[in-house]
Amino acid sequence: MSPSDVPINWKRNLTVTWLGCFLTGAAFSLVMPFLPLYVEQLGVTGHSALNMWSGLVFSITFLFSAIASPFWGGLADRKGRKIMLLRSALGMAIVMLLMGMAQNIWQFLILRALLGLLGGFIPNANALIATQVPRHKSGWALGTLSTGGVSGALLGPLAGGLLAGHYGLRPVFFITASVLFICFLLTFFFIRENFLPVSKKEILHVREVVASLKNPRLVLSLFVTTLIIQVATGSIAPILTLYVRELAGNVSNIAFISGMIASVPGVAALLSAPRLGKLGDRIGPEKILIVALIISVLLLIPMSFVQTPWQLALLRFLLGAADGALLPAVQTLLVYNSTNQIAGRIFSYNQSFRDIGNVTGPLMGAAISASYGFRAVFCVTAGVVLFNAIYSWNSLRRRRLAIE
């Protein structure tokens, strides 16, 4: 029996990677509530300049992550996924530490770009688990894993706000670096992977990767679905607080109401993702994907007609429950339509599309709201998701006809 054939405890790996994704999600979102304040502290003054630099330092991380992800994915397929998890956690910890020492906005911008280049813990965690878990449990495992990052992202802003209030802005970066270093230690000591390194000559090139896919068109449609999921999520983010203020009128606790409405989809996804992932293992992830996309459309449209913040909160909770099924369903279908040999690159390509969606979504939402108002954003987003539902259904139908 070769080393790669030795059984490993994938359930323990799932638990540890869940903790790693939780810590990574929390670490990234810890600094988000006060990012514009830190930009201001670094010497940027004036409303327009502050808006421009805040947008730049936010989006540049996703942009550089989209560029770097395929490279790291290829390296993961050559050297193993565990070493990529270690590289990502340690690299991000060092960059976060340096961010707390930044003296001007250019240093901070470069470090935010470097954070994107060195990131990739969550897609590599997905690739690791996808290659270890039994195929018939992929939906449940990837759905469960997705709740780690969601949980961290939900708790991160709250913890970041509290820490910044007590200790100031710079110490939060040092605390975040410590959290990421803990993630590195957990990965180093507790994650097991049996991986035989592949030489550079043996690694498949992009054309060979595409040729090895069971259904290249379907995989491309899944990448597009990931992009549109993030566009739909991100398009609402820039206008949410302003829309809530328009609905609520003059109330003193608008920040609390907006924060609650912003977080309810994450709570719903946290509850629904493992259950819908398990259901997908039974009835097929493709059915879960199409139904969840259609439900998302049916929930986005009435959001443009709500009259109170609580109506919006209810619809966003239901939308979060549906969205909790989307990315795990996409990831499960990627597992079904690729091999372990190329899993790192497939998940990294998917991450690149996700990052592109993270950049373009807020830009789309801001442009639509500036031209047509807040309510139009929900209608246009619903149209984009509807297009994706039809496109995905057509791709899955072609696959089914090809099999028959």
UniProtKB/Swiss-Prot annotation:
InterPro entries linked to this entry: MFS (IPR011701), MFS_dom (IPR020846), MFS_MdtG_subfamily (IPR050497), MFS_sugar_transport-like (IPR005828), MFS_trans_sf (IPR036259), Mutidrug-R_MdtG (IPR023692), Tet-R_TetA/multi-R_MdtG-like (IPR001958)
Chief place where the protein resides: membrane
Keyword Membrane: yes
Annotated TM spans: 19-39, 56-76, 90-110, 113-133, 149-169, 171-191, 222-242, 254-274, 288-308, 317-337, 376-396
Record has NAD as a keyword: no
Alphabetical keyword list: Cell inner membrane, Cell membrane, Membrane, Transmembrane, Transmembrane helix, Transport
Gene Ontology CC entries for this record: plasma membrane
Mode of membrane association: Multi-pass membrane protein
SUPFAM superfamilies, A to Z: MFS general substrate transporter (SSF103473)
Gene Ontology MF terms: transmembrane transporter activity
PROSITE patterns: MFS
Compartment(s) of residence: Cell inner membrane
Superkingdom of the source species: Bacteria
NCBIfam families given in the database record: PRK09874.1 (NF007372)
Family: Belongs to the major facilitator superfamily. DHA1 family. MdtG (TC 2.A.1.2.20) subfamily.
The name this protein goes by in its record: Multidrug resistance protein MdtG
Gene giving rise to this polypeptide: mdtG
